[in-house]
């Protein structure tokens, strides 16, 4: 058993899903008579479905229940990813190198299980452990998702490399005590003590000791 593990975020980190979410959110808000912009989407980056629904309800021009809005949104995004899910550059290659290095690895996402399962079915990506919004009482930026992933994978958080693309995800992983590698997608993420920031998954390498910046 390896002494270290790798914990991957999903949306924006492994898959280029933010344009897909923007498409689905825009369609839902059009049904509710309200505009939706990229600035609105940035407010929700790395957050939970409940947070998205609350934000969208506040902007809606027509009445709708939270459950109905959530159902519309999840139906739209799930149908979209079943057709095609664009991977981020280097995602499949990094996962393959993590597997070859014998590193246990988990997927840690704020998305619902229905969406996560659709993404995994579409991409064929495989993980030793899966943690989604359905598995926790508090999602990112709370540390619970990463604490649960570390527990399930059997490696202390301090020995887990957490790869994230959003400020909420980085906050979650750092609060859990993980070694954070940030790969910003939509929102910039600055350097901080103990945090590695790279431009792309292509800038990372995996070996038996974990994940590091290529050339570093």
Give a label for each model feature.
Residues 1-42:
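Active-site neighborhood of HAD-like aspartate-dependent phosphohydrolases
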Residues 1-4, 96-99, 103, 112-216:
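Asp-based, Mg2+/Mn2+-dependent phosphohydrolase catalytic module
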Residues 16, 107-109, 182:
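Hydrophobic residues in well-ordered beta-strands that form the structural core
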Residues 22, 26, 49-54, 70, ...:
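An amphipathic alpha-helix signature
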Residues 23, 31-67:
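Alpha-helical substrate-recognition element adjacent to the catalytic core
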Residues 27-32, 93-103:
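A short, Lys/Arg-enriched amphipathic alpha-helix followed by its capping loop at the start of a domain
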Residues 35, 56-93, 101:
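Metal-dependent phosphoesterase signature
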């Amino acid at each position: 058993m390896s002494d270290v593990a790798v914990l991957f975020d999903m949306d924006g980190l492994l898959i280029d899903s933010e344009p897909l979410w923007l498409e689905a959110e825009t369609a839902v808000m059009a049904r509710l008579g309200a505009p939706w912009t990229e600035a609105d989407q940035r407010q929700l980056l790395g957050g939970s479905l409940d947070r998205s629904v609350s934000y969208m309800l506040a902007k809606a021009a027509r009445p709708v229940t939270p459950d109905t809005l959530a159902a519309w949104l999840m139906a739209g995004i799930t149908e979209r990813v079943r057709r095609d899910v664009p991977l981020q550059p280097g995602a499949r290659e990094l996962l393959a190198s993590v597997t070859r290095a014998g590193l246990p690895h988990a997927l840690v996402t704020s998305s619902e299980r229905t969406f996560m399962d659709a993404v995994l079915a579409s991409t064929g990506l495989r993980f030793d452990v899966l943690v989604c919004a359905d598995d926790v009482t508090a999602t990112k930026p709370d540390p619970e998702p990463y604490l649960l992933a570390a527990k399930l994978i059997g490696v202390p958080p301090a020995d887990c490399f957490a790869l994230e693309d959003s400020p909420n995800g980085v906050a979650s992983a750092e609060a859990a005590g993980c070694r954070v590698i940030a790969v910003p997608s939509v929102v910039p993420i600055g350097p901080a003590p103990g945090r590695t920031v790279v431009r792309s998954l292509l800038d990372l390498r995996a070996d038996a000791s974990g994940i590091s910046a290529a050339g570093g």
